[in-house]
Amino acid sequence: SENKSKLAMLNPSDSIVDWVLKTVPTMGAGWCPPGMLGIGIGGTAEKAMMLAKEALMEEINMDELLRRGPQSKMEELRIEIFEKVNALGIGAQGLGGLTTVLDIKIKDYPCHAAGKPVGMIPNCAATRHAHFTLDGSGVANIIAPKLEDYPEVTWDSSSSKRVDLDNITQEEM
């Protein structure tokens, strides 16, 4: 969803987490959440945006990262942004809910000490992808994953609010 991409030239002391938490709500539902956020940090403005786009092509592995725990500052940052963006309650299609992002991907690059370029690109269904190889031996046979392949998911729904979309009022939005 490049039309919802964001770029900021932050000061070196500015918090990337704070910027993301301030910026994500301004993107509305046009990026089709839940999805991923690709974040590029460093280089120039152009490089930060390229890093953000490249980051979106990485494999979704947040469940694995949460299970094993962070092993670097970058993984700690990914988890912090993931948890805090989901805590915003934006939810699927911006209608409220527990899951706004499925993963956070970050790539960084050295930059001038006087600035901190940060680019953020959200993905939508158009950028979700699968990897496969065509070897010329015949028709591609892509097998859908089994339900057992998906992780078991549980959450506390006590703070959730059920919304009747057929009868929602402006005040309830």
Feature map (PLM): residue ranges:
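Non-transmembrane, aqueous-exposed alpha-helical and coiled segments at domain scale
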Residues: 1-173
